[in-house]
């Protein structure tokens, strides 16, 4: 099932020189976002920069959100990850999609125009309503913190 999402092209090179984000295969969960930079951009070791993608989206449906995730190859091979780890796009946001790129490696990395730098994934959203209680119903796990669910 495909859900229509409104997209606005902010950079005229999208749709002419570079394709609109799309799923690469029928099983793809994410669409690649590209670096729509005017010139090559070098990230020094430890440096973070905000990179335009050339598009804006409006999800509109409050039961959906979008997340911007890193591309595994860039992170593993070059140390390029998202500066904010995950970007959350709320359904009512309508501004440009930007990618915070962080070079966590010890060597400079150069981004070129149109390079695929992140993925856009749409996810379902559940808005919770808190119910105040004095005590929780007991569970086997109880109050065990991080690493307390066992090893097997």
Curated annotation (Swiss-Prot):
Pathway: Pyrimidine metabolism; dUMP biosynthesis; dUMP from dCTP (dUTP route): step 2/2. GO terms for molecular function: dUTP diphosphatase activity; magnesium ion binding. Substrate binds at residues 71-73, 84, 88-90, 98. It catalyses: dUTP + H2O = dUMP + diphosphate + H(+). SUPFAM superfamilies: dUTPase-like (SSF51283). CDD domains: trimeric_dUTPase (cd07557). NCBIfam families: dut, PRK00601.1. This is Deoxyuridine 5'-triphosphate nucleotidohydrolase. It comes from Shewanella denitrificans (strain OS217 / ATCC BAA-1090 / DSM 15013). The gene is dut.
């Amino acid at each position: 099932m495909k859900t229509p999402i409104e997209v606005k092209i902010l950079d005229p090179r999208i749709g002419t020189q570079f394709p609109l984000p799309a799923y690469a295969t029928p099983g793809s969960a994410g669409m690649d976002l590209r670096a729509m930079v005017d010139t090559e951009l070098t990230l020094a070791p430890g440096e973070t920069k905000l990179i335009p993608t050339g598009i804006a989206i409006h999800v509109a449906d409050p039961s959906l959100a979008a997340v911007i995730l890193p591309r595994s190859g860039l992170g593993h091979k070059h140390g390029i990850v998202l500066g904010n780890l995950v970007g959350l796009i709320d359904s009512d946001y309508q501004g440009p999609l930007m990618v915070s790129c962080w070079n966590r490696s010890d060597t400079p990395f150069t981004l070129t125009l149109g390079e695929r730098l992140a993925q856009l994934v749409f996810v379902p959203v559940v808005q919770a309503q808190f119910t105040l209680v004095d005590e929780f119903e007991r569970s086997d796990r109880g109050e065990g913190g991080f690493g307390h669910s066992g090893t097997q």
